[in-house]
Design a protein with these regions (language model features):
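Repetitive helical segments and hydrophobic/amphipathic motifs
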Residues: 11-12
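Sec/Tat signal peptide C-region and signal peptidase I cleavage site
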Residues: 5, 15-20
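Intrinsically disordered, low-complexity proline/glycine-rich segments
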Residues: 19-139
C-alpha cells in the first residue's frame, strides 16, 4: 500500500503525468495490477479486482495518504527539488526528485537511490528498480 501510493505520488506530482478519470497499472509482463480513479483533488487506488486499497488527498503543503479505512498513513511535502515523504508519525521515509530530462528518481531516507520513473511519448510511465529493471507501468 505505502509502496504503491509512493509510486502514484511520484507519477502524479513529479513527472507531470496527468491521470485520466481512470488510470490502470500493469506489472512488467503487462498484466493489470490495479487502477487509480480521480475525483477532484483525491485519487483512490483499487486492486485488480476493484477493491479499494487506499487514497491520497491534496493539502496546502503537499499530499496525505490514507488506507482503505480512511486512516492517515503518511504525507508528502513539496520541497525546492521535489517532494519528501513521511510516515504517519512525521518521520522522513524518503524523497522524490526530478531532473531536467523529466526522469524522477526515488531515494530512501538515507539518500540511497531505490528506483526511477520515466514517461515516454505515448504517455506511458514506467517504473524501474535501482538497477534499471522494469517493475511496473501506468497508462
Amino acid at each position: 500500500m505505502k509502496k504503491l501510493l509512493s509510486l502514484l505520488v511520484s507519477l502524479f506530482l513529479l513527472t507531470g503525468y496527468c491521470f485520466a478519470a481512470t488510470t490502470n497499472s500493469y506489472d512488467k509482463y503487462g498484466s493489470k495490477t490495479g487502477s487509480y480513479r480521480t475525483n477532484g483533488s483525491t485519487v483512490t487506488q483499487y486492486d485488480k479486482y476493484g477493491n479499494k486499497t487506499g487514497s491520497y488527498r491534496q493539502t496546502s503543503s503537499g499530499y496525505n495518504s490514507y488506507d482503505k479505512y480512511g486512516s492517515k498513513t503518511g504525507s508528502y511535502r513539496k520541497t525546492s527539488s521535489g517532494y519528501n515523504s513521511y510516515d504517519k508519525y512525521g518521520s522522513k521515509t524518503g524523497s522524490f526528485k526530478t531532473n531536467s530530462n523529466g526522469v524522477t528518481t526515488k531515494y530512501d531516507k538515507y539518500g540511497n537511490k531505490v528506483g526511477s520513473f520515466k514517461t515516454d511519448s505515448s504517455g506511458r510511465t514506467t517504473q524501474y528498480d535501482k538497477y534499471g529493471r522494469k517493475v511496473e507501468s501506468y497508462k
